[in-house]
């Protein structure tokens, strides 16, 4: 059990209401943590109506890289692609994730498939959603040559 998110203990949903919104905030000191938090829902407090959903929290980090740095392969690979290369070896059939030339050759498709435009679709990469926004930003800085700016 991870305790790094604050959200209301209970919430009233009116009859016929199709959606609900509520604030979810990160607890102080937990920015570097990552994991899942379950939200259990019941109707009128009845256990028979129970269901749950998960919140996923990604770690917020700058990888120890100063803002404005030009990102090179040695800065990006161990922080972003190495995990995916080791965890998903079948991916190397399409793009060898451990080869800088192959990554740069596939720059445009990688930028497209890791962009927010694909979020929420089956085309968003990686399919397992294991790449944090900070990792995607580092990969984007490497591929575009833009100076590194960690997401806030």
Predicted ranges, named:
Residues 1-152:
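Aromatic- and Gly/Pro-enriched helix-to-coil junctions and flexible linker segments
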